């Protein structure tokens, strides 16, 4: 089958991109290929469901720009489509004095990014927002909320198809042949021809990109599993909304935090441990070929050397419920190991370059017949409509 545009990947970014293209130009023939039998199965459907504000990201970066624009677009979309969401606000809490300068830097960054109402709060105010939370300093970020991103992605898919887009489920991409003005995409259920391939394959985005070019790719996806605990129901009162620690500025993860969920309940987590399989949601899941690729990547070896202490701490928390609880106790001293019930896990696709740099920003590249979204971790779900709009602009310039 022939299409002017084919999107690979039925996560929230791929679906948002397809929707944006069909909204901008309904006459373009667009298809989306997804290897699973449903959309939003992986990163989109296995995250903490937070609507991010843009607090953490370097001013002028793609993350800052797209998160702030995406936040407003997402809220409007949810309102228009009657998707349940709540703007709960959150607190970011320094639990030690040495974290206060980092907290102040976060506040300054948020203000530079245009956040409204974000401010330092007193410890009395902290007790008002989160009565059981402890710390030496805190900021309050009202532009933060919660939503079920799987519902959002499914609505993107519905509207994309109403506008004439086609979604092909169960179509795993096996091979891409590049010709002068077209690409032939071979899948597990047949072949497709397209003028423009848009790669939104998430955990396999580097693999798809490599299929589409002869040169060796200079980045590789490293899968990090994030594990969650649920707070047992009778102890959910310990958390009113969202409580975050001050993140390690050298590590691209936000640290274990507390999140009230849209479906009900409270989750604690995630940690960040190397997954031994790209879609390895359990400790026992191993793909030896994928693991060997990760371990042999020069960039990962440098990351492991640089962050080995942090990595060992995360691994210890993965296997020790007590250690996980101890990390949570820094924010809520009353939390007990017995309050935690093992929850689910997600796997984050984190791009790593050859020099050992964990890419801190979104990474979108284009070549002759393709656009590749190579790094779209958090806050990509919040930013999805904005990222989709950016990719849409790049795509429509070709027609």
UniProtKB/Swiss-Prot annotation:
Protein name in the entry: L-2-hydroxyglutarate dehydrogenase
UniProt source species: Indibacter alkaliphilus (strain CCUG 57479 / KCTC 22604 / LW1)
Entry keywords, A to Z: FAD, Flavoprotein, Oxidoreductase
Catalyses which reaction(s): (S)-2-hydroxyglutarate + A = 2-oxoglutarate + AH2
Enzyme Commission numbers on file: 1.1.99.2
Function recorded in the entry: Catalyzes the dehydrogenation of L-2-hydroxyglutarate (L2HG or(S)-2-hydroxyglutarate) to 2-oxoglutarate (alpha-ketoglutarate). Active in vitro with the artificial electron acceptor 2,6-dichlorophenolindophenol (DCPIP). Also displays a very low oxidase activity in vitro on L-2-hydroxyglutarate with O2 as the electron acceptor, but this activity is most likely not physiological.
GO CC term (a single one): cytoplasm
Pfam families: DAO
Enzyme class, spelled out: oxidoreductase
């Amino acid at each position: 089958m022939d299409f002017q545009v084919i999107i690979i990947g039925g996560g929230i970014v791929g679906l948002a991109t397809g929707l944006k293209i069909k909204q901008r130009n309904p006459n373009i023939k667009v298809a989306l290929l997804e290897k699973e039998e449903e959309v939003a199965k992986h990163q989109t459907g296995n995250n903490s469901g937070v609507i991010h504000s843009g607090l953490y990201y370097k001013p002028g970066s793609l993350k800052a720009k797209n998160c702030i624009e995406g936040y407003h677009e997402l809220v409007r979309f949810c309102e228009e489509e009657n998707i349940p969401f709540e703007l709960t606000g959150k607190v970011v809490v320094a639990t030690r004095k040495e974290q206060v300068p980092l907290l102040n830097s976060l506040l300054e960054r948020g203000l530079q990014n245009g956040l409204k109402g974000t401010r330092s709060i007193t410890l009395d105010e902290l007790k008002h927002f989160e009565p059981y939370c402890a710390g030496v300093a805190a900021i309050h970020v009202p532009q933060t909320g919660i939503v079920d991103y799987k519902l959002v992605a499914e609505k993107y898919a519905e509207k994309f198809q109403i506008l004439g887009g086609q979604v092909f489920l169960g179509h795993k991409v096996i091979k891409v042949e590049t010709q002068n003005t077209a690409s032939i995409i071979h899948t597990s259920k047949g072949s497709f021809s397209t003028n423009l391939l848009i790669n939104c394959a998430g955990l396999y985005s580097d693999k798809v990109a490599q299929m589409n070019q002869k040169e060796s790719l200079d980045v590789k996806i490293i899968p990090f599993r994030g594990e969650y605990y649920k707070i047992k129901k009778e102890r959910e009162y310990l958390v009113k909304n969202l409580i975050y620690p001050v993140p390690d500025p050298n590590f691209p993860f936000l640290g274990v935090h507390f999140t009230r969920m849209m479906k009900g309940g409270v989750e604690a987590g995630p940690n960040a441990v190397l997954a031994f399989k790209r879609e390895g949601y359990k400790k026992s899941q191993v793909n030896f070929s994928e693991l060997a690729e990760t371990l042999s990547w020069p960039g990962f070896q440098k990351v492991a050397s640089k962050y080995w202490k942090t990595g060992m701490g995360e691994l210890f928390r993965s296997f020790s419920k007590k250690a996980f609880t101890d990390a949570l106790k820094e924010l809520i001293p009353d939390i007990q190991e017995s309050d935690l019930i093992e929850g689910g896990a997600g796997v984050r696709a984190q791009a790593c370059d050859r020099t050992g740099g964990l890419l801190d920003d979104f990474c979108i590249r284009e070549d002759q017949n393709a656009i590749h979204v190579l790094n779209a971790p958090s806050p990509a779900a919040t930013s999805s409509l904005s990222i989709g709009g950016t990719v849409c602009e790049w795509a429509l310039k070709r027609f």
